[in-house]
Amino acid sequence: IRDCLLSRGLGDVYKRQEIEAQGDVVAGKEILLIPTLNYSSMNAEKKKWISDDSDINRSFPGNIEGTATSRIAATLMDRVKDYTYGIQFASFYLQGISIPHVRMMETGTESTSLANLFGMPYVLTGDTRSFDTATLNYNWQKMGTQAFSVYSATTDTLDGESAKMAVSAVLRFLTRMGIIRYESHGGYISTTLKEKDLVSVRADEAGFFRCIVGVNQEVKRGQVLAEIINPMDGNIKAEVLAPTDGIVFFVQNSPLVFQNVVIYKIVRRMHQ
């Protein structure tokens, strides 16, 4: 059994080095860890390819004769094609804070039972949209690899506790699959959700965003989640109300919001 980790942080590199040094990788197993595919952009504090703003994660399966990002994608696909499991530390597509979770695309080959072994609070599955066919996760699954995207709470800020939860989830999965020897607690009994079942809350007005209810908090229908403040006079332009009972899955964390953008996502309460 071989496992590939595509990481967004050095903490994962250090942890792998520690595991290898202690001889905790089970005989006959192999772990490949790739810290990043885009060093130059990372050094310039950019997410996309620095020269043309193209997205590597919209370039798969890639073309070895194509553009820079397409060549990188093709090289990666060739390097990881024989691995049984693939884990990507991904960034949430909206700016903000979310409950840590693991996500799989619905390609017909996904296994939520395997995703539950990470022991994260939620397993999120999503329909495959047209642009998803050019992502790493989708193409990994199509190659026969069980591919997972692991999300910590934030991407653009340091959150030690959230990052520790994500790394622990991966170590837990590798332990349960018999790839490493590692003592870890059992984690969460994961709740499996479809991405389309998350209730989106949009801003009715533009202005300063004053968050009242944060992520992972329980809310009641009609409860005030946030206020949007007029930047000219400081008065409240609008109150953001919860459309349903549930738990806040995501909240945006920008001080300014535009009208009609998603500012909250709520897990609808399933049982009374």
Question: For the regions a protein language model found, what residue spans apply to each?
Answer:
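Conserved active-site and cofactor/substrate-binding residues in soluble primary-metabolism enzymes
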Residues: 51, 67, 71-74, 110, ...
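His/Asp/Glu-rich mid-to-C-terminal helical/loop segments that flank catalytic regions of hydrolases
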Residues: 164-182
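Long, positively charged, glycine-interspersed low-complexity recognition regions
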Residues: 268-272
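Active-site/substrate-binding loop(s) of hydrolase catalytic cores
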Residues: 12-135, 139-153, 158
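Single conserved hydrophobic/aromatic residue that forms the stacking wall/gate
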Residues: 1-14
